[in-house]
Curated annotation (Swiss-Prot):
PANTHER family: SMR FAMILY PROTON-DEPENDENT DRUG EFFLUX TRANSPORTER SUGE (PTHR30561), SPERMIDINE EXPORT PROTEIN MDTI (PTHR30561:SF6). The chain crosses the membrane at residues 6-26, 36-56, 64-84, 88-108. It is found in: Cell inner membrane. Belongs to the drug/metabolite transporter (DMT) superfamily. Small multidrug resistance (SMR) (TC 2.A.7.1) family. MdtI subfamily. It comes from Cronobacter sakazakii (strain ATCC BAA-894) (Enterobacter sakazakii). It is a multi-pass membrane protein. This is Spermidine export protein MdtI. Its main location: membrane. GO terms for biological process: glycine betaine transport; spermidine transmembrane transport. Pfam families: Multi_Drug_Res. Catalyzes the excretion of spermidine. It comes from the Bacteria.
């Protein structure tokens, strides 16, 4: 799969966006005490996996999954910081940095 088409990249971007939305809605669900957000979160995860399934038709699985997971985590950290005032400590930032370095290495492999 050397030829990655724009449609597969767009599917991957959609999967990443849905993953982020699912995580935010999961936080809003307050441990499923607010079931509308909980159910919406589950639906967003299902949609994210469906979009990822379309993306891997044109992007190698390891690359697509690493990008999906890595960008999803990084953006969720940012959303937690901006929306909920959650902060990472030094170890958390180091882990996020290692994750991003790992994504680059996988992409270059």
């Amino acid at each position: 799969m050397s030829q990655v088409e724009l449609q597969h990249i767009l599917w991957l971007l959609l999967a990443i966006g849905l993953e982020i939305i699912a995580n935010i809605w999961l936080k809003f669900s307050d441990g499923f005490r607010r079931p509308v957000y909980g159910v919406a979160s589950l639906a967003a995860v299902l949609a994210a996996f469906s979009a990822l399934g379309q993306a891997v038709e044109g992007i190698d699985l390891a690359v697509a999954y690493a990008l999906w997971g890595g960008f999803g985590i990084a953006a969720t950290v940012a959303a937690g910081w901006i929306m909920f005032g959650q902060r990472l400590n030094r170890k958390g930032w180091a882990g996020l940095g290692l994750l991003l370095v790992g994504m680059v290495i996988i992409k270059l492999a």
